[in-house]
Amino acid sequence: NVVTLSQLFRNNGYHAGRVSKIYHMGIPFEIIAGTADHDDAPSWDETVNIKAPEQKAPGKRTEWSPKDKSSQTFTGVEASTGDLEHADGMAADAAIEFLKQNKDKPFFLGCGFVRPHVPLVAPSKYFDRYDRDAMVSPEVPKGDLDDVPKIIRNYKSIDRYGVTPELHKGLLEAYYASISYMDEQVGRVLETLDELGLRENTIVIFSSDHGYLLGHHHKFQKQHLFEESTRVPFILSVPWITKSHGHASNKIAELVDLYPTLA
């Protein structure tokens, strides 16, 4: 009986579409297979699953966490193929097509870009933007974890992943390259809103499901209660509320606030 956010809009005459990862998806496996086994059918009028090579992409493959062989390993690929040969370029293409096909009707579009989720795959030109040797690991204060339980001190630690100082530089470079690749695809979608004359009548939200540790507190990835893991990027663009344009807020907000705000 739960009505999801997109379903609420759909029930009120909006055409609702999903592109790529919105509900939970096994990455990289479901991207490689082009499936979305945890999707919620009543939420959408149309869906697009992305099928991309992920770590199987041609190019220079790197391994930044030699002790970790799980699906969350820090594999990287400086891909020799272009933007549109990878998941987020494909997702941007599908989102752009959705906007073109539905520009004359009320719509709700959820577009899930997968980078910088591991594997850290991006065309090589995005790696070229960064100097690996100049990467700086997060500074961790002495005794930072002395006041937390041992199970937390050892959870997803640098030692568990086997990340050396030199490997850490490569990991950061690959992470930043993945972000730049994703950011470029977001820009393509926003440019399409402008080209179609939709920007001034469209609410745009950019956010994520969690933050990420990249050596902060001598730890990696998510599932921590440190701010770097729980805090998410959050940009809300409402063209007709002009007084807030370009302003940041220090007020506490949560992702659960989105539903009542938009409803």
Predicted regions located by residue number:
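Formylglycine-dependent sulfatase
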Residues: 1-263
